[in-house]
Amino acid sequence: MEGPALNAEDLLGPDGEDWRVPVSELEHRQGELAHRLREAGLPGILIQHPIDLYYYAGGRQNGALFVPAEGAGGSKDAGGDGPVGYVRRSLRRAVHEAGGDDAPHEITAFPSLRVFAERLRERGVSEAPALQFGEVPSSFATRFSQALSGLGASSDGTGVVHAQRESKSTWELACMEEAAGVQIRMFEAVEAVGGEGVSELDLVAAAEAVSRSEGFAGQVEMRRYPLQCDRAVVVSGRSGGVSSFFDSAVGGVGPHPLSGMGAGFAKVKANEPVLVDLVHLHRGYVVDMTRMFVAGSMPKVWEERLEDMIAVKEVVVDVLDRGEHCSKAWEEGLALATELGHADHLMGMAPDQSRFLGHSVGLQLDEAPVVAKGFDRPMPLGGTMAIEPKVVHQEGCIGSEDTWTRDEDGLRPLTAGGAWPWVTTW
């Protein structure tokens, strides 16, 4: 293998920890994908999206991972060699991140696209693998579908991948629990520096310092275009009533028009609600939590609104806990919010209202299913979801949010839950 020598000790996490995805995880994921491909009637798939390369191959190097369906051409069941990673750069890092000598798949240099289909054919592949048409840019997908046309037409495998990633493994949940521990320290930092006269951006900076020191890489991954999100939304008073381009309850002013959401230069004023919505990622895995702060005392009208949103949250949790559909949780949550007089302010102000009460999280912030109309299925076992009913008025916003998971016993919070108060006073 050509190129500079790779010292594995240079690629460790804090205090010498090995932060690679365990080989056993990669092996199980690839096997499960092969099974799901067969069930979907697809001969195989070419994984090219960076997030999914990390999920299946252990790293997001520039390349692609071919995974054949169970029993299909190229699979070990059919006499082939099984999954193979084709890497442009960095090949050495790809080998290391996949487990080195223990990697569950072969890793080799990416051939010229002119001969790519032939290289797959040499591995026993007789049909064009599916591509991630729902994830990668159209021009990129077209280039590969044309290169593979000698094997036939490529189908879309996006849904198969998304469906598999909905249920998290024990290891993934442990990553999210680790993230939640860091997140508590982020809220503690906001509590320590906050008060009347402190800017929203200064509050974000305090939380950001904790998150960065614990390994946050600076990017919150999104599934929906334009793939942009501010990982810390802190809005005080009237800033909380400003809508933005982002499909969420709370917009925020932001520092300038290109970053027109989240924290801006507004300063905390006495007795005004300050909403703090913080995300932390541990080894790529997202947890999302919102709490309220106030310098002085929270006005009674805002206290009542918060109590109502906590009641809506409890309804949503109860429905999902029973294993009923996410759409049912939306219907019942919306019905209670409407009954309590919040129809025009739930998850934003008309006409800029978001139509959901919870969103799944994982390696991306906006995964499925969602507590919204049309998601006529339960939250899956192993699913992880941020549940976040909020109300927005011109003078501010209020609500709560925790990230939950569902197991055989029902829902349980991964983030603080009742361990951090709904309102913290400076």
Where are these regions (language model features)?
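Active-site neighborhoods and metal-handling regions in enzymes and metal-associated proteins
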Residues: M1-W426
